[in-house]
Amino acid sequence: MNFKEKDPALWGAIADEEQRQEETIELIASENIVSHAVRTAQGSVLTNKYAEGYPGKRYYGGTQYIDVVEQLAIDRAKKLFGAEYANVQPHSGSQANQAVYAAFLKPGDTILGMGLDAGGHLTHGAKVNFSGKLYNSYSYALNPETELLDYDMIRDLARKVKPQLIVAGASAYSRTIDWQAFRSIADEVGAYLMVDMAHIAGLVATGLHPSPVGIADVVTTTTHKTLRGPRGGLILSQAENAKKINSAVFPGTQGGPLEHVIAGKAAAFFEDSQPAFKEYAQQIITNAQAMADEFSQLPTVRVVSGGTDNHLMTLDLSQTALNGKQAQELLDSVLITTNKEAIPNETLSPFKTSGIRLGTPAITTRGFNADESREVARLIVKTLLNPEDEAVLTGVRQRVKELTSAHPLSQLD
């Protein structure tokens, strides 16, 4: 008896999700579509093996081949980013950040990170998160006129609050970040500099965004998003920080590593190092910029900061009849997947928001080009401006199916 026959309820849910991914235009900026190699590695027998510790220094026997896999992931990550040290064990970006805080700080120390409505992440000091509960957290905002990072404003705030650690990097910021400016601020106030490049790591790896590696004291990232790997985390740093970061990950914040996921990371890092991946990463940016440009020519909606330098953008809906939650649900109904997102100086709750976030990694993986990305922008605005016109919504839904049928997931290796 096969899986489908043994457990039809679970099989059915997985099959339904597979169909949803096949039929929808996926614009959640933190999502992508992994290769067959990544899925094979992650679904391998490595899931059976417990391996507390690090290569060559485990607490269990039978880890000789696990060590090979993890060392491959470490070496490939170091080469990909030009780093002296890499830890591939964090289960997620959030746990990578948690381990860094544990390595460099003590509870009650002050951290300074980007606010949520400016595009920051929960783990950058949000009061509802461990980072805002265990540490004395402050947030910097964007310049209210330009909607860009204002390094003079950040410097003034850093001088005032005197953080032990400054977090640079974002979850929803569409412009190039000046790592050297952050380094200068951190040096002036005597703070460590941590960069969370989770969203842009694939662009950094291909030289399409400046790299923080070697500038920051420590760099964290997820391994999915623009890296197109399995869901997981990664920490990069200088060799001198290896011991305290390793200890903070294990045994400090985690137990046994997920070696099947680490195998998926190794597979992804290999793919990310190939020339074709740089072409792919460039197309991600090209598609995002085409989409942002199209929005600028359409009524009612506005791209925060006026455009994008990377893979994502936040769409300000405050001049429409919809909030972010309503827009997300409406777009879901026409098979376009997005997520609600706070805009700078947000006035609505995090459960509603005044914007939506859009990203192009997944559609670029499917093979969408710039013209198709522009069309997707037009379909989004058409939907948002006609929320109750079933004829319009039906037409959009049909066009989405045509676009996704032209780029089936089955074509991917």
Swiss-Prot record:
Which reaction(s) does the protein catalyse, per the Swiss-Prot or TrEMBL entry?
A: (6R)-5,10-methylene-5,6,7,8-tetrahydrofolate + glycine + H2O = (6S)-5,6,7,8-tetrahydrofolate + L-serine
Per the entry, which co-factors are needed?
A: pyridoxal 5'-phosphate
Record keyword Cytoplasm present: yes
What is the originating organism of this protein? Levilactobacillus brevis (strain ATCC 367 / BCRC 12310 / CIP 105137 / JCM 1170 / LMG 11437 / NCIMB 947 / NCTC 947)
Q: Which family does it belong to?
A: Belongs to the SHMT family.
**Per UniProt, where does (6S)-5,6,7,8-tetrahydrofolate bind?**
116, 120-122, 349-351
Q: Does the keyword Zinc-finger apply?
A: no
Q: What is this protein called?
A: Serine hydroxymethyltransferase
Q: Which parts of the sequence carry N6-(pyridoxal phosphate)lysine?
A: 225
What Gene3D superfamilies does the record point to? Aspartate Aminotransferase, domain 1 (3.90.1150.10), Type I PLP-dependent aspartate aminotransferase-like (Major domain) (3.40.640.10)
Specify the enzyme's EC class, one word.
Answer: transferase
Which compartments does it reside in? Cytoplasm
A Pfam family found in this protein is: SHMT
* GO MF annotations, alphabetized: glycine hydroxymethyltransferase activity; pyridoxal phosphate binding
Which terms does the UniProt entry file under GO BP?
glycine biosynthetic process from serine; tetrahydrofolate interconversion
Known SUPFAM superfamilies for this protein?
Answer: PLP-dependent transferases
Main localization of the protein described in the UniProt heading: cytoplasm
